C-alpha cells in the first residue's frame, strides 16, 4: 500500500517548476506517492516529472476531471471525441511515467449539472470509458472512476451507482475510486460502501468534510478505515485538500473553496501523512480483538 498526497496541496501550477516542487514537498512530508492533476495532459512535462520522481524516490499516479468541452457523457459526438482523446493522452502520460493508476471524474464533466444524465449520454460515457480502459490495459494501467457528490456530476454519486456502471463494461482494469469527502455527502454511512465495492475498489482519497485538517470535521474516519481493513484493501490511499492560497482562482471557484482552512501546507501535509498512517496501523490490531 502506498500513502500519497494530491499535488494541489502544494501548488496550483504544474509547469516544470511546479512538478519539481510538488514532488519534493510530497517526499518531505513523508508520503510514498504524488498524485499529479493532469489539467492538460498534452502539455505535461513527462521528462521533468520522471527526473523528479527518480531523484526523490517517489511513485506517481494521475487524475483529471473532464470539462464541458470534453464531456464524454455529452450527446454531441464531437465533444465525446475530444474527451476520449484527452483521456487517451492522459493514459499515455501515465505509461511514459511508469505509473499504473489513473483516476478522477473521467466519465462526465466535473461540474454541477442542471438535468439528470440522459440514456444517450450514459451510453456515450460507457463506450468512451470502455475504449480508454482497453487502451490503458494494453499499457498496464488501472483506470478508477471517482465517485463524487451531486454538485460535481450527475452520473456517479454513490459506490453502488459505480458498480452498476462498471457491470456493463466488464473490464478487469476498470475500478472504483472512493473519496471520503464525497462519501460524507452522498453515502448513508462510511462502512457499507467499502464492503459493497470491495472487489472493484482500486483507489481512495482521504479528505475532510470541509477540505481542511483531517480529524477536525464530520467525516467518520474510524469507521472508514475499519472498513478498509475488513476488505484487506491495499491500493493507494491519497490525501486531498484544497486552499485558494495554493489552488488557481478558476479551480478554487469550481471546487467552491470560499474560505481557507489552512495556509501552511507543509504542516498540513505532515499532519495528514501521520494521521493516515496512524489509522492504518491501528486497524491492523483489530484481528487481535
Curated annotation (Swiss-Prot):
Residues at the catalytic site: 146 (proton donor/acceptor), 240 (proton donor/acceptor)
Family matches, as SUPFAM superfamilies: Xylose isomerase-like
Biotechnology: This enzyme is an ideal candidate for the industrial production of D-allulose, which has the potential to be used not only as a food ingredient but also as a growth regulator and/or agricultural chemical.
Enzyme class: isomerase
Cofactor annotation: Mg(2+); Mn(2+); Co(2+)
Cofactor remark from the record: Binds 1 divalent metal cation per subunit. Seems able to use Mg(2+), Mn(2+) or Co(2+).
Name of the molecule in the record: Ketose 3-epimerase
